[in-house]
């Protein structure tokens, strides 16, 4: 049975051994559900129906089924930080996105059979390590050049935020997707399109009669201008792809060593915490657990079982 790793697995190994053992060895995640992940997952499901040829109504019904009940129970629409994840905000944004950007208007053609494609591709000649993931759309074909690309949907609080676009310049996920697609299909895959959808709070929902300083009219009349969607092309040189593979195999070996060295919860106090040195503790899901001293007897209270397949997408 080969060792299977996703991009998120390798990224976690690169950041912190403790987070790696917790997430992938002991299969634990932070208690509670992340609104960003919950909304992002629902948007992905909505787009899957849309890109596979479903109607706008069918796509929005999927969004409602996956997100409405949870959002209404967990999100305060007036909350300064979480309000953008309210059901009404997500519903309005996605309803407009589907109306404004039909699949037929994209600069490439989409094969419905190549939407939401799971893959497991051997990283090594022996086949003992496989890279796994889910491509939101594989082998889309540019209408003008006839070249092939992949597509990855991304939701974010701010497309124009200083950190959003730069994360893809050297990021491993798109390089890994590109390498995997080139291994899977006979056609030459040129790059990956990031379909970025901004899930920021629409000002219209807070005060529809307030006048917009940018458009000179009430927010209720210009709210659609505040929906931000961008299609961003990511490309890599041949050397960058080769270097990625070398690094991916090295991190996979380190991952294997961690699982073998620290197989039980009782080993947690001995696992290295590199995050203290590289800053990854700041946004880590396990920060509270580690700050409390990694209490093994509190593991079941401070964390919860993790759904493995959710890792494939990131």
Regions found by a protein language model. Give the residues of each.
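A non-catalytic, helix-rich entry segment at domain boundaries
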Residues: 46-118, 122
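Active-site-adjacent bridging/hinge elements
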Residues: 16-22, 147-155, 254-257
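Conserved aromatic-histidine-acidic binding/catalytic patches
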Residues: 31-35, 39, 82, 125-126, ...
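Hydrophobic/aromatic-lined pockets within catalytic cores
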Residues: 26, 48-55, 102, 123, ...
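Metal-dependent nuclease catalytic regions and adjoining charged, substrate-binding loops involved
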Residues: 5, 167, 179-314
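Non-catalytic protein-protein interaction segments used by genome-maintenance enzymes to assemble
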Residues: 114-175, 179-181
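Regular secondary-structure segments
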Residues: 44-55, 252, 256, 260
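Nuclease catalytic cores
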Residues: 10-53, 91, 116, 280-286
